[in-house]
Amino acid sequence: MTSFPFYLDCDTGIDDALALAYLLASPQADVRGIGAVSGNVSAAVGARNTLDLLELAGHAHIPVALGAHDPLAGSFGGGAPWVHGANGIGEVELSMAAAGLAPETAAEMLVRLAQEHPGTLRVLAIGPLTNIAEALRLEPSLPQLVAEITIMGGAALAPGNLTPVAEANIANDPEAAALVLSADWNVTLVPLDVTMTNVLEENHRQELLASSGAVPRALGEMLGYYFRFYEGLFGRACSAMHDPLAAALAVGAVTPAVAPVVHVDVDTTSGPSRGQTVCDLRGLYMDYPEQPGARCRVVLALEGDFAPHLVETLLAYSSAAAASEPVGATVA
């Protein structure tokens, strides 16, 4: 099976942790570097969570770079502790990794990796797009160096989750999102339309908790916190699968059922629709005819049920740490 070099940009909360573990377990992904950005938590906390998860997974060799603390305009809003816990990973305490941060910013790391792997590097962005925008400013030819970028963010027809119309990753830095989505590269946008309709249930969490692997068990514990938040949205203990679904699409392990390539704009005004992704879906009634110049594939629906694939992949985790005891991986 062909493996592609990946750069992951994340704001490591609970679903980011799931996405990271999924990438590490996927034979299609060769993670060469990870950048942290403020979103669910601050960039510094997200970087620490990422380092600790990599240590637990036996992948401490993967470099982690600190990225932007604040969005391009304004300042960091403080994260989402009511969703992810104060520490971003559901109050689960992981042993602190010995590895430190890479001696470069996340934007510099992305540019370097793109130059080292021209035409083959895949980018998966599952947080606000500040680091990606800064990389574009640093290297304007970045879109020609990157094979494709997959972004978890936006809401096409679905309601928002930060405001009535805006999804959190986009709304936390609309200016960055506008810059990234207007760049001349192949984008796959994974919005709330598909991530909110693919749900992880309590029986899936119990499978992770029953695993002999350190990583699946830690993820199962984190999901307890996540499920309690989503119970207020779904009426039962479960959760949406935002970031791991984007990861699976990025590696090509799942197939979109509806994914038109359309023009997408981001509202950067100061009004009530700030952060909204305006997707041109007017071709809906003609099976989405081609839109000249459009480069953004918007995934609206998925073939099959994603949850069993996610759990199976995580349970089959083959890292050296998977069968070890999760020292410190307990709920605080």
Residue ranges and their predicted role:
Residues 4, 47-116, 293-305, 313-315, ...:
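Metal-dependent C-N hydrolase catalytic cores
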Residues 64, 180, 247:
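A residue-level signal for conserved active-site and pocket-lining positions in enzyme catalytic cores
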